[in-house]
């Protein structure tokens, strides 16, 4: 995954 996508993906998955 891309750097931007990975960041958003992990951030959303944290919830």
Swiss-Prot record:
Superkingdom to which the source organism belongs = Eukaryota
Kindly state one GO CC term assigned in the UniProt record: extracellular space
Q: Where are the transmembrane segments?
A: none
Q: Please give the positions of the paired cysteines in each disulfide bond.
A: none
Q: How is it modified after translation?
A: Glycosylated. Contains mannose and N-acetylglucosamine.
Keywords of the record, alphabetical order, are: Disulfide bond, Glycoprotein, Hemolymph clotting, Secreted
Q: What is its main location?
A: secreted
Protein task: Forms stable clots in the presence of calcium.
Could you give the subunit structure recorded for this chain?
Answer: Homodimer; disulfide-linked. Also exists as oligomers.
In Swiss-Prot or TrEMBL terms, this protein is called Hemolymph clottable protein
- According to its UniProt entry, this protein's organism is Penaeus paulensis (Pink shrimp)
């Amino acid at each position: 995954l891309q750097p931007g996508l990975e960041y958003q993906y992990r951030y959303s998955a944290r919830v």
